[in-house]
Amino acid sequence: MDQSQDLSVSRLANAWAELQAHARDGSALDSDAYRLAFADPEFLLRRETRGIRFQLEMLKPDLGQSEQGIESTVVVFGSARFPAPETASASLAAAEANLAKIQAAEADSAALLDAKDALMVAQRYTRNAYYYDQARLFARLVAEHSNALPLADQLFICTGGGPGIMEAANRGAHELGAPTVGLNIVLPHEQSGNKYITPSLNFKFHYFALRKMHFMMRAKALVAFPGGFGTLDELFEVITLVQTSKAKALPIVLFGSSYWKRLINFDVLIEEGTISPQDLKLFHYVDEPQEAWDIIKTFYQL
């Protein structure tokens, strides 16, 4: 259907209206066999139509970004569990107050142990909120640079759309008025896009594979902050794609050198011959937002 064609005068409108009515008030749908194929959710969710779903999940975010001029992104990965400093401070204050209350009441040992555990978690949140601030500052540097350029030359922050580091990066760019992209994923515990993503660039995926393809399709740089399994999965896929020349070389930045060096001993891989020393040049360690941005600027001679 032509993009400019009004849906209300299209012959496809009836199928859409039927689905809307069914969702709204339970209006009866035509029998499965009589429905138009694209308006039959049960058909589209069959195992045999998985390939079609792949295509749709590839196409929809691609068109959405192209139509809004999003062609070059800086992808920021990192933990969803690192809160904003203000949130961490509030959690710490609440945990300290709760522990003091339990100690004063001379509560049983189980309650005291729980309160101490909660305090340890709150202290960890407070410590890791540092990375939230750093991701936010980094995104501001990208947005500040891009805001002065024509649309075709701008770099846009793209994240996984969730809380924590992802929210921080979207937030930093949003605060300077720049559009930001979020590539959310459907999870058992439902993730909704953070409030700093541009609504028309807030996409949701079912398939991790398609989501990761979209991270790479427009990426001009990747900055990985400390994170867990999801961050590691995304990071190592990018490194592998560049190492094997399946993707063009691009800056890959690991923010927080102490975290990454404690987590992964790449020297072991060299010692065992599973990678070459040259492979360590595929990425950079940094500890400051400006360092990360300088690596990107140098790579592209900005």
For each predicted feature, which ranges?
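Solvent-exposed alpha-helices and their adjacent loops that cap or buttress functional pockets
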Residues: 66-69, 148-152, 174, 194-196, ...
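Phosphate/pyrophosphate-binding betaalpha-module
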Residues: 156-225, 229, 236
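C-terminal functional extensions of proteins
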Residues: 250, 254-302
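Short, solvent-exposed amphipathic alpha-helical segments in soluble enzyme
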Residues: 91-93, 174-175, 237-242, 268-271, ...
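Glycine-rich beta-alpha loop segments
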Residues: 21-24, 28-180
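Glycine-rich anion-binding loop/nest that anchors nucleotide
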Residues: 220-239, 250-258, 288
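Short, acidic/small-residue loops that bind anionic groups at enzyme active sites
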Residues: 177-190, 239-262, 278
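N-terminal, charge-rich interaction modules
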Residues: 2-25, 31-35
